[in-house]
Swiss-Prot record:
PANTHER family: DCTP DEAMINASE. It comes from Ehrlichia canis (strain Jake). Its EC number is 3.5.4.13. Catalyzes the deamination of dCTP to dUTP. It catalyses: dCTP + H2O + H(+) = dUTP + NH4(+). Homotrimer. The keyword Nucleotide-binding applies. GO terms for molecular function: dCTP deaminase activity; nucleotide binding. Belongs to the dCTP deaminase family. This is dCTP deaminase. The lineage of its organism: Bacteria, Pseudomonadati, Pseudomonadota, Alphaproteobacteria, Rickettsiales. One of its GO terms (biological process) is dUTP biosynthetic process.
Length: 187
């Protein structure tokens, strides 16, 4: 696998709408940076958040996630409670080519404050807004900022195309438009 450079990311974003909207430079003046970097793309988060709370003490179960465990907020700054997490989605919509796997890593600025971002790989053929999870690992409240850089996506090109893409597998998170909670298919 090869890590794809800025010019490849830019070409795919412009020609195939791989990232939309796409910022072809690094915006960093007084904010958490976002946009095109040497070997990746720093994405932003929207201002709609699902804040995990323990007001209804239940067992967290990915097969039967307790919906009442979230508070929905729409604001430019989100406060993550101590030792808790928040779900958000990217501003950018992604369309991943069939020969590309995308990995996500956190921003060093957030990491240095005890805020960790987590997302699973964007698989070949997947498209949608990316649901991100921000964990506050500290015993104090922590802030994250809407419409600023939240994470970096790194594009890995496979030696050949996969036999079956996420779209062709009819993946359960295909074309998600909002923050999406866990889905377990019962087939």
């Amino acid at each position: 696998m090869s890590v794809m450079p800025d010019h490849w990311i830019k070409d795919k974003a412009i020609q195939e709408k791989m990232i939309d909207p796409f910022i072809d430079y690094k915006e960093s003046s007084g904010i958490l940076s976002y946009g095109l970097s040497s070997y990746g793309y720093d994405a932003r988060i929207d201002n709609k958040f699902k804040i995990f709370t323990n007001i209804n003490p239940v067992t967290v179960d990915p097969k039967n996630f307790p919906l009442g465990s979230f508070i929905d907020k729409e604001e430019d700054i989100c406060i993550i409670p101590p030792n808790s997490f928040v779900l958000a989605k990217t501003v950018e919509y992604f369309k991943i080519p069939k020969d590309i796997l995308v990995m996500c890593v956190g921003k060093s600025t957030y990491a240095r404050c005890g805020i960790v971002v987590n997302v699973t790989p964007l698989e070949p053929g997947w498209e949608g807004y990316v649901t991100l999870e921000f964990s506050n690992t500290t015993p104090l409240p922590a802030k994250i900022y809407a419409f600023e850089g939240a994470c970096q996506f790194i594009f890995l090109k496979g030696d050949s195309q996969c036999s079956l893409s996420y779209n062709e597998m009819k993946g359960k998170y295909m074309k998600q438009l909002d923050v999406t909670l866990p889905i377990v298919n019962n087939s």
